[in-house]
């Protein structure tokens, strides 16, 4: 009995002070971290190229990481380009190629319109010249009713008829001229030419400027025996044909 009491006393004395105050099973160990239980995450799946693969697959993870990197790279490049575009100095509208092309197109259209107008004006001018010449020719051919002569003496003047038919009868031609013009003819001479036509020289009995012009206007351009004849007033010295 005494031995047990001695042993119990030794055991009590051998304990530390903290062991004597707090039971051993209630002492929390200091400095020892509790092990956390690893929670196993649920495994997911992803679709790659039409196939269902595990989300924890290394290839899938690498592709996702590469996609994120590419996305960030594209965003940074777009931001960089946007900053360069904003910092770019504004060009003058006149220096733009599109403006230059439009301006050149406008100039070309203006030049084309001006060229067409010039060509039209040239044609109109040419047409007017032709009309004036035609009108002037008709006036010359038709003759004016007003006949003026500053020389009162027309004794040396006569009428020359060209492009008559070969072998025309002088007396018949004289009678026709007198009957139509009502002018007396003193002499008429006809000569056949090697060219195939005949020429007549007509001298009036009482030549005056008015009577000569009257006969010329009546017979100039007349159709005689199928030929269009011409009549001119000439001086006796200028008619060098021998009859």
Curated annotation (Swiss-Prot):
MF terms in GO: nucleic acid binding
UniProt superkingdom: Eukaryota
Region of interest called Disordered, as start-end residue ranges on this chain: 71-120
UniProt record, GO biological process: mitotic spindle elongation
CC per GO annotation: nucleus
Modified residues (Phosphoserine): 96
Compositional bias segments (type: Basic residues): 78-88
Keywords: Phosphoprotein
Note: Present with 2140 molecules/cell in log phase SD medium.
Protein name: Uncharacterized protein YHR127W
Taxonomic source organism: Saccharomyces cerevisiae (strain ATCC 204508 / S288c)
